[in-house]
Amino acid sequence: MNKHDREVMAAFFAQVDENGISNAEKVETRHHVIRRIETTSKDKSYEDASETIDNRAEGLPIGVVEVDGKLVGLGIHIPNEDVYPLQSFEIYLRGCDLVGNLDISGCSDLVFVDLYRNRISSIDAANMPSLRILGLQSNQITALDPTEMPACQGIDIGMNRLESIDVSRNPELVELYVNDNCLTSLDTSHNAKLKYLRVQNNAITDLDTTGNPLLRHLYATGNPLVRIRALAPGGEGHQPLELTAEEGGFVGLSFNPIYNAQWKETGEWEQSYHAYPDDGFLFVGWYDESGKCVSEELDWMDEYGASRVLQANFVQVVCSSSLV
C-alpha cells in the first residue's frame, strides 16, 4: 500500500468519540464478519465467518483490504470484483460505532467501501477514479460530493441527513439509494444505466425518471410528490407511467422484481401506486386520461410493466355542526 493510502487509513482509525475511544479500538472489540461464498446456504443472504480471507493490511485494523500491495477495500472485500450480480463478499465494519470524518480523497486504487450503521459525520471522496461501490447507509452524513467518482456503479447513502446530491457526473451508476434523507429534489437524467433507485421518505415534490430507460426497481413512496414521470418497467423505455395528485394529497410509485434471500430475481414482479390524503381530505380514486375511475384502492397493485397515466383525486371532508 502506498504511503498516502496508509496515512489516510491510519488517520481515520485514530479518530476518537466523545468518550475518547478510537475507531481502531472499536473495530477490535466490535467487528463482526459476515460473508457469502459458494457454499453459503441458498436460503441465506450471508453467513457468519469464523475465518476470513487473508487480506488484512499490515499494521491496520481488520477491514482495511490490501491486494497486490494496493488498498482496494474498506469494510468489504469482493474477491472477484464481480458486482452485478454480487456472488461473494466479506463484510467487516458494519455497526462498529465508527465516528468522525471519512477522508478517502486521493485513494486512487480504492474500489469498494462498506461502512453501514456507524456514526460517520462527513466524507471527502475527491479524486477517486477506481471507486465502484460506496456504501454508507445509516450514518450522520449531511453532504456527499460524488462528482470525482466517475467509475462508481453503486451509491448507498440512505438513512443519513443529505439535503441534496448531484449525480450528473456519474454515468456508470446502476444503483442509487438515497432513501430516508432530507432531499427536496433529485435529477437522474444523466444516469442512463440506472436500474435500482430508492428515494422513499424524503421531501421530494416532483420526480422524473424518464431519462432512465433501464430502471426496473423503484421506491418513490413517503414523499410529498404531486407528480411522478417514469417509464413502464420492462418496456424498453417506450411506454409512459405517470402519476399526478390533485389538490388534497400526494402520490407514490413502486415497482420491482421479487428477490430471494440472496438478492436474485425469482421471476415474479410488483408494481404499485400509492395515494396519501392530506389531513381533512379523503382519497376518491385513480382516474385515467379519459376521466374513468379505474381503482379506488389507496395502495393499488397493478400488473408489472403496465403503462398508465393516472390522476389521484381527493375530496375535502366537510364537517357539519349544529347548534343545540
What do the predicted segments below correspond to?
Residues 250-272, 293-301:
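Short, solvent-exposed S/T- and G/P-enriched segments that are highly enriched in secreted/extracellular
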Residues 71, 86-88, 99, 110, ...:
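Conserved hydrophobic position(s) of the canonical leucine-rich repeat
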Residues 270-296:
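Surface-exposed interfaces of beta-sheet-rich extracellular modules
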Residues 74-76, 89-92, 113-115, 132-136, ...:
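Conserved hydrophobic beta-strand positions in leucine-rich repeat
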Residues 1-100, 108, 224-250, 256, ...:
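N-terminal capping/linker segments that flank leucine-rich repeat
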